[in-house]
């Protein structure tokens, strides 16, 4: 049905725009594939139905308005689709994804399909709360300025008792870290129930705070099997006076995540977001969804921190692409820049920013590169890079803090990192 391919269409400021990387089956023309994507992800179905006459499809249909071949790839195209804003429920990332990526990825005429980027018009984010607090409010709450923040995931991630877990938290925070973190798989298992962990961690937080004079946090993982249980854990964290809780937003789901974000804003809790399961969705180059789309969705659904890869030691091109979605998380206005993987100019207007978290395989020798790449508004998480120190956890934390302060001072003095 080629009525969904409309190259003459002028996109509206209120449209949601999507860039899909399409690989059609052999023999299927690109225009036909692009039209099929637009139809299946909006008002179309596999046949003409008489009830189409009861609505104005021209007002509600998605339109494929541009198709460009991908240079260097055989039979691969970027298809641009515009969706009228009325197709989406206000304040629901869940509904946005159900529409745009819900069904179309299993389409027979396509060999593969990947959602590369979305342009969210300012009218739509205005219906979301977004991050519970955002970067500036977080700095004010923590009273920490002019440098990246330091974190560490407590390992071994599974198997410690609550008491020993709390001890590891205390040692890291006492040594100089700002945050420690529950691993994403730490929920409430037989060897360590969530309530016991929360209690011992709270004790560690306040002891470290009293001895260092710095505000300390531990990402208490509230992720649970039901959203009611998740809220119960968040409430208990607040009752203990903890400054921050954590959620696995992809495994926990956007609906639960947005509920938790509302609770965190109402109750002064920061919200740390882990992206467990993201590689299932974003790892394949030609099928699935790019992480920058998941990052934009999280900024709308709500979170103050999100894991965003490390950049260090990878290819240069990957560095640019990672910095592209790091900017999408932090900045108000991001210009279209294809070299950084940004297909559309994105204007967030006044929505608070999210702090990117660099985590996984980094250690103290990466500090100069990390401070240069990420700047101040980031959390640098050294897991094995703290707990793997030959002298113990606290000296590992000291090493990271000293390295960070040295790099920040060198940068401020204008030296070459």
From Swiss-Prot:
Catalytic activity as recorded in UniProt: 2 (2R)-3-phosphoglycerate + 2 H(+) = D-ribulose 1,5-bisphosphate + CO2 + H2O; D-ribulose 1,5-bisphosphate + O2 = 2-phosphoglycolate + (2R)-3-phosphoglycerate + 2 H(+)
Pfam families: RuBisCO_large (PF00016), RuBisCO_large_N (PF02788)
Family matches, as InterPro entries: RuBisCO, RuBisCo_large_chain_AS, RuBisCO_lsu_C, RuBisCO_lsu_C_sf, RuBisCO_lsu_fd_N, RuBisCO_lsu_N_sf, RuBisCO_lsuI
EC numbers for this chain: 4.1.1.39
Biological processes, Gene Ontology terms: photorespiration; reductive pentose-phosphate cycle
GO cellular component: chloroplast
Textual note on the cofactor: Binds 1 Mg(2+) ion per subunit.
Gene3D superfamilies: Ribulose bisphosphate carboxylase, large subunit, C-terminal domain, RuBisCO large subunit, N-terminal domain
Site (Transition state stabilizer): 314
Record: active site: 155, 274
Compartment(s): Plastid, Chloroplast
Molecular function (Gene Ontology), one example: magnesium ion binding
Modified residues (N6-carboxylysine): 181
Binding site for substrate: 103, 153, 157, 275, 307, 359
Residues at which Mg(2+) binds: 181, 183-184
Keyword terms: Calvin cycle, Carbon dioxide fixation, Chloroplast, Lyase, Magnesium, Metal-binding, Monooxygenase, Oxidoreductase, Photorespiration, Photosynthesis, Plastid
Cofactor(s) required, per the database record: Mg(2+)
UniProt miscellaneous comment: The basic functional RuBisCO is composed of a large chain homodimer in a 'head-to-tail' conformation. In form I RuBisCO this homodimer is arranged in a barrel-like tetramer with the small subunits forming a tetrameric 'cap' on each end of the 'barrel'.
Subunit structure: Heterohexadecamer of 8 large chains and 8 small chains.
HAMAP family membership: RuBisCO_L_type1
The protein, known as: Ribulose bisphosphate carboxylase large chain
Natural source organism: Acrostichum aureum
Designated gene of the protein: rbcL
């Amino acid at each position: 049905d080629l009525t969904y391919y409309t190259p003459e269409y002028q996109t509206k400021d209120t449209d949601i725009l999507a860039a899909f990387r399409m690989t059609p089956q052999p023999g299927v023309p690109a225009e036909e594939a692009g039209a099929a994507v637009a139809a299946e992800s909006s008002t179309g179905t596999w046949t003409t139905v008489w009830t189409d006459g009861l609505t104005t499809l021209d007002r509600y249909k998605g339109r494929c308005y541009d198709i460009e071949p991908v240079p260097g790839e055989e039979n691969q195209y970027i298809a641009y689709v515009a969706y009228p804003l009325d197709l989406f429920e206000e304040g629901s990332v869940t509904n946005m994804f159900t529409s745009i990526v819900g069904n179309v990825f299993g389409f027979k005429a396509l060999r593969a399909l990947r959602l590369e980027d979305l342009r969210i018009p300012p009218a739509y984010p205005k219906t979301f709360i977004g991050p519970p607090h955002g970067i500036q409010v977080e700095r004010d709450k923590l009273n920490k300025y002019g440098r990246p923040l330091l974190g560490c995931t407590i390992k071994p991630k599974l198997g410690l008792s609550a008491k020993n877990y709390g001890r590891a938290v205390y040692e890291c925070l006492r040594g100089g870290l700002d945050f420690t973190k529950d691993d994403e798989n730490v929920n409430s298992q037989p060897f360590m129930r969530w309530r016991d962990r929360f209690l011992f961690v709270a004790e560690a937080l306040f002891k470290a705070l009293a001895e260092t004079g710095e505000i300390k946090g531990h990402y208490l993982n509230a992720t649970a099997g039901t959203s009611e249980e998740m809220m119960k854990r968040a409430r208990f964290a607040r009752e203990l006076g903890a400054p921050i809780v954590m959620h696995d937003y992809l495994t926990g789901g956007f609906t639960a995540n947005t509920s938790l974000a509302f609770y965190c804003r109402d109750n002064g809790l920061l919200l740390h977001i882990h992206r467990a399961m993201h590689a299932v969705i974003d790892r394949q180059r030609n099928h699935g969804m790019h992480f920058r789309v998941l990052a934009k969705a999280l900024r709308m659904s709500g979170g103050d921190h999100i894991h965003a890869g490390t950049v260090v030691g990878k290819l240069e091109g990957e560095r640019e692409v990672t910095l592209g979605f790091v900017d999408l998380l932090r900045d108000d206005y991001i210009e279209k820049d294809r070299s950084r993987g940004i297909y559309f100019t994105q204007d967030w207007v006044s929505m608070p920013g999210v702090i990117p978290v660099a985590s996984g395989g980094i250690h103290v020798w990466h500090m100069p590169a990390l401070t240069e790449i990420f700047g101040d508004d980031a959390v640098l998480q050294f897991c094995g890079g703290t707990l793997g120190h030959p002298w113990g956890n606290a000296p590992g934390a000291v090493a990271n803090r000293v390295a960070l302060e040295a790099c920040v001072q060198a940068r401020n003095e204008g030296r070459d990192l």
